[in-house]
């Protein structure tokens, strides 16, 4: 169906542009962006995600460093390792693969990453920039991917009613800030919201991001709505499904993203785009400091 949004194709366009940009940057600087990925433990899903990030990074000319640590590591020791990466001038961007073991203080770890290398956009300083409307720092990649998809299919967002189901720091909160900047009327709902279908069925755009498999069926959506499914739910081994009942909903809405193949590839594309931005920012800083 031509109303199914091909996130992989959109992501490939971004990656192709990034590859050319990296080639140009390398010719100018004789160096390449480098992404450090901190992986604690051996969570199977995390390992898959990390391998995918590394594969896509290498495809477009971004070097990578995988720092794989034991689940027994203490918060302070992990912070020390992150500080080493912060001080390494060869490292452009740093991501800490989530989730972390429960024994580790996640907030302390995310705050330990230098804001200038925080390409996930999770450091409190970068969060503050976004919610203050300051065009500086980094924005969470999934939120950027969602916005790019939405704007591709609805270029004029002024006055559009958008419902975001989910209030996470990764999707719901940052995406709401981005959409407010686009002059949308944004409603944030969550798993405790009442009469949810009566809210979502009036929306022009619905973003589902609560991690509840196939929860949202046809009665949740207006026939002219755009549906963005950010849910990633693993069932029956490695099979992944979204929060939206895709098979039944896809013919009942204007546009819809599938899972997999929708927002996932866009998230990786914007992660790498942020890596290139961090590289350019750091190189610009070095050049200016030499003047």
UniProtKB/Swiss-Prot annotation:
InterPro entries: Aminoacid_DH-like_N_sf, NAD(P)-bd_dom_sf, THF_DH/CycHdrlase, THF_DH/CycHdrlase_cat_dom, THF_DH/CycHdrlase_CS, THF_DH/CycHdrlase_NAD-bd_dom. CDD domains: NAD_bind_m-THF_DH_Cyclohyd. GO terms for cellular component: cytosol. Keywords: Amino-acid biosynthesis, Histidine biosynthesis, Hydrolase, Methionine biosynthesis, Multifunctional enzyme, NADP, One-carbon metabolism, Oxidoreductase, Purine biosynthesis. It holds the Pfam family THF_DHG_CYH. NADP(+) binds at residues 166-168, 191, 232. It catalyses: (6R)-5,10-methylene-5,6,7,8-tetrahydrofolate + NADP(+) = (6R)-5,10-methenyltetrahydrofolate + NADPH; (6R)-5,10-methenyltetrahydrofolate + H2O = (6R)-10-formyltetrahydrofolate + H(+). Pathway: One-carbon metabolism; tetrahydrofolate interconversion. Its EC number is 1.5.1.5, 3.5.4.9. The keyword Isomerase does not apply. SUPFAM superfamilies: Aminoacid dehydrogenase-like, N-terminal domain, NAD(P)-binding Rossmann-fold domains. PROSITE patterns: THF_DHG_CYH_1 (PS00766), THF_DHG_CYH_2 (PS00767). GO terms for biological process: L-histidine biosynthetic process; methionine biosynthetic process; purine nucleotide biosynthetic process; tetrahydrofolate interconversion. GO terms for molecular function: methenyltetrahydrofolate cyclohydrolase activity; methylenetetrahydrofolate dehydrogenase (NADP+) activity. Belongs to the tetrahydrofolate dehydrogenase/cyclohydrolase family. Homodimer. Catalyzes the oxidation of 5,10-methylenetetrahydrofolate to 5,10-methenyltetrahydrofolate and then the hydrolysis of 5,10-methenyltetrahydrofolate to 10-formyltetrahydrofolate. NCBIfam families: PRK14171.1 (NF010768). This is Bifunctional protein FolD. It comes from Rickettsia felis (strain ATCC VR-1525 / URRWXCal2).
